[in-house]
UniProtKB/Swiss-Prot annotation:
Organism: Drosophila melanogaster (Fruit fly)
Annotated UmuC domain residues: 17-231
Organism domain of life: Eukaryota
Similarity comment: family membership: Belongs to the DNA polymerase type-Y family.
Region (DNA-binding): 212-277, 288-413
Gene Ontology, cellular component aspect: nucleus
Principal subcellular localisation of the protein: nucleus
PROSITE patterns (alphabetical): UMUC
Motif (Ubiquitin-binding (UBM)): 669-686
EC number annotated for this UniProt entry: 2.7.7.7
InterPro entries, per database record: DNA/RNA_pol_sf, DNA_pol_Y-fam_lit_finger_sf, DNA_pol_Y-fam_little_finger, Rev_trsase/Diguanyl_cyclase, UmuC
Protein name (database record): DNA polymerase iota
Catalysed reactions listed for this entry: DNA(n) + a 2'-deoxyribonucleoside 5'-triphosphate = DNA(n+1) + diphosphate
GO molecular function: damaged DNA binding; DNA-directed DNA polymerase activity; metal ion binding
Length: 737
């Protein structure tokens, strides 16, 4: 069967559409579960209303959406079954959908109990058979009921609709035989007419519409609210325009309609009035979101909210287990009641979650069928995430009234069963732990101890290169392990797929952020400078090749940075670049007069001729400025030695304090906070920063062995001394160490 050609048929009378509506669905499912209820007046209760009832109860005056008290007054022998748990109805709906797929893949679900089917391809297939080609009377009822034959239309749709009635009859019989459920069916050439004509005769019956009587059928509907696609608000607007029936809408002045509704809406309403509908039957796949909401009396206590979320989460996980996919996002829905304004409004927050919170196992006895379950301890972690989202919506310092709570899982992904996924072989934990660069912008430096992430904080991490942005200390950074480092936009807060705790108001997956034009230009400039930097420097630029303590600290603001080239900079007020690369400066170490000094390649060549040229060195290191104040020559940049720092006199201590007070701090360090630190701590910080630069330069220029020997023969290196003790830098600035 050529189903692709069916989608292109939007002309009049070319398609054959079947609409199936299950009879009193919730109540019928309960009758199937308990056959003794078939002869009794049965109502399905949700909260304080009867959401639906069987035909025995309807015969006694009970209607849908009637209050429980009123229904029991009208029908004292009414049997009520709690229908708040939708799991049995959801399972039956899926079984119905699976059965319909045996006839055509073009099946569109409309709630639990309704389905559209485009059987055009199946009808064409049966038309090829001689027995079916003969014009046989349709099965079931026909509109109009005066005996008008389907052949009243000469476009050839009569035979197609007649075959469609036989297909609908076969489907209804199979549903009754295999699932024990009955339904009504409507057959027409479009979705709108098929749905409306199917309700003409119920329960457990079917009706076909003669195509040429579509306008008359719509006119006889009378009330506008019976037309699918016209809601309560639209009906009120039509009443204001003087139209209360379908017939009046058919005869309306289109100029008046366009002024009131606009061209598109006015045209759509006019088409609905005449039964015109070109919408296609869109095959339903697995849902993008699985959610659940619970309306309640006003809640104003946090513990009550947490308990209701716990119940919702437990029921929601059961639905995920049936679905078989793993969600990577969870959304909280709240309806807050304003007692002063006497109004309610909804608010939502969403957060990404780790797939590792779920585990997949094979169902026993069923080949190829997997079941998704929560991992050990995952429910408590998810509940903590939910409550954090709740506290982002509700100000806990003020009174609140919650009248509805909801949870939803989204961003589903298929998960392979077992541990043989290729990702398990390509990812190493050691590599992942170093591929992050911490920003120190807008941080609080008052805590002297590092905090280790708790288990629930780990659940927020969607990737090892991200941190929890709910705490301003963390800023998202990402790098690659390629020789050319990724440009980091210090002002970007996008990339929701990499965030650990991202807030959204919608459930759609956000697209990946595009690279800016300046980013592409800087990447091009970086590639042209590869010859200057050399292959070894490129390797050092990879975060996976460096220790975390060797990575310099970045800031989100515009600050001085290492230059990207060896060209000397003579400008003292050049703006700092917005984008940064994790790239050490192109410098070399020279041993002059028995001490280590920082000089650039170009400065080294001019050192003998111009001793003051170091002042224009392309390495604007803040440490250079601080050391230059106490050094005997402007061309020397001696490294501080721990041994000389430990033994100081009162006069030298005063000089050191003055020098440290005027130091220009490196990128990412607050100068005011630095000045408040003890003198020995300031000295240690400077030594640690310089040792990191030394290590980077040694690896860049291939002089690691020679420099190490030189350091060993002279004063002991600070990095070596600090290796035996905890680096104070990370005690004050890093919380994820």
């Amino acid at each position: 069967m050529d189903f692709a050609s069916v989608l292109g048929k939007s002309e009049a009378h070319q398609r054959t559409i079947i609409h199936l509506d299950m009879d009193y669905f919730y109540a019928q499912v309960e009758e199937i579960r308990d056959p003794t209820l078939r002869s009794k007046a049965l109502g399905i209760q949700q909260k304080n209303i009867v959401v639906t009832c069987n035909y025995v109860a309807r015969a006694k005056g009970v209607t849908k959406l009637m209050l429980i008290a009123e229904a029991q007054r009208i029908c004292p022998d009414l049997v009520l079954v709690n229908g708040e748990d939708l799991a049995p109805y959801r399972q039956m709906s899926q079984r119905i959908f699976d059965l319909l797929l045996n006839y055509t893949p073009l099946v569109e679900k409309l709630g639990f109990d309704e389905n559209f089917m485009d059987v055009t391809a199946l009808v064409e297939l049966r038309q090829a058979h001689v027995a079916e080609a003969l014009l046989r009377p349709p099965v079931g009822h026909t509109y109009p009921a005066d005996g008008t034959p389907l052949s009243n239309c000469d476009c050839g749709c009569a035979q197609r609709l007649a075959i469609g009635t036989r297909i609908a009859q076969e489907i209804r019989e199979e549903l009754k035989l295999r699932l024990g459920i009955t339904c009504c069916a409507g057959i027409a050439y479009n979705k709108l007419l098929a749905k409306l004509v199917g309700s003409s005769h119920e329960p457990n019956q079917q009706t076909v519409l003669v195509s040429t009587y579509a306008e008359q059928f719509m006119r006889e509907l009378g009330d506008l609210k019976r037309v699918t696609g016209i809601g309560q608000k639209t009906q009120c607007l039509l009443l204001e325009a003087g139209m209360s029936s379908v017939e009046q809408l058919q005869q309306c002045d289109m100029d008046v309609m366009r002024k009131k509704f606009g061209f598109e809406t006015a045209t759509r309403l006019r088409d609905l009035a005449f039964g015109r509908d070109t919408s296609l039957v869109r095959p339903s796949g697995k849902p993008k979101t699985i959610g659940m909401e619970d309306a309640c009396k006003p809640i104003s206590v946090r513990t009550d909210v947490e308990e209701r979320f716990r119940m919702l989460l437990k029921r929601l996980v059961e639905q995920v287990a049936e679905d078989g996919r793993v969600p990577i996002a969870i959304k909280v829905v709240l309806r807050k009641f304003d007692s002063q304004k006497k109004s309610s409004h909804r608010e939502t927050k969403q957060a990404n979650i780790l797939p590792s919170l779920f585990k997949t196992s094979m169902c026993p006895g069923e080949t190829g069928v997997s079941k998704v379950q929560l991992a050990d301890g995952a429910q408590d972690k998810l509940l903590k995430i939910v409550m954090r989202l709740f506290e982002r919506i509700v100000d806990m310092s003020k009174p609140f009234n919650i009248t509805l709570l909801g949870l939803a899982f989204s961003k589903f992904q298929e998960r392979k069963v077992g541990s043989s996924s290729i990702a398990n072989f390509l990812i190493k934990k050691a590599d992942l732990e170093v591929q992050s660069i911490t920003s120190l912008t807008n941080t609080s430096l008052t805590s002297p101890t590092a905090e280790s992430p708790t288990s629930d904080e780990c659940a927020f991490r969607s990737s090892p290169t991200t941190f929890k942005p709910s705490d301003q200390f963390y800023r998202r950074r990402a790098t690659t392990a390629s020789p050319v480092p990724m440009l980091l936009d210090n002002g970007s807060e996008s990339a929701a797929t990499n965030s650990d705790f991202s807030d959204f108001s919608e459930t759609e997956v956000e697209p990946s952020p595009k690279k800016s034009r300046i980013g592409r230009l800087l990447v091009s400039k970086r590639s042209r400078l590869a010859a200057d930097v050399g292959d070894s420097a490129a390797e050092v630029a990879s975060p996976s090749k460096l220790r975390v303590c060797d990575l310099r600290l970045n800031s989100r603001d515009s600050e001085k940075d290492f230059p990207m080239s060896t060209t000397p900079s003579t400008s003292t007020s050049a703006p700092a670049p917005r984008f940064r690369t994790v790239q050490p400066p192109n410098t070399l170490l020279q041993r002059i007069d028995g001490s280590l000094r920082f000089v650039t390649t170009r400065t080294a060549s001019r050192l003998s001729s111009n001793a003051s040229s170091t002042a224009s060195s392309p390495l604007p290191s803040p440490m250079d400025d601080s050391i230059a104040m106490s050094a005997p020559s402007t061309t020397t940049l001696p490294f501080p030695s721990p041994t000389t720092t430990a033994v100081v006199t009162s006069s030298s201590s005063t000089a050191t304090c003055d020098a440290l007070t005027n130091i220009v701090c490196p990128a990412g360090v607050d100068a005011e906070v630095f000045k408040e630190l003890p003198v020995e701590l300031q000295t240690e910080l400077i030594a640690s920063w310089r040792s990191s630069l030394v290590a980077a330069v040694e690896q860049t220029n291939g002089t690691g062995a020679a420099t190490s020997a030189a350091i060993a023969s002279g004063a002991p290196a600070t990095a070596t001394t600090a290796s035996g003790q905890k680096n104070t830098l990370y005690r004050y600035f890093l919380r994820n160490k």
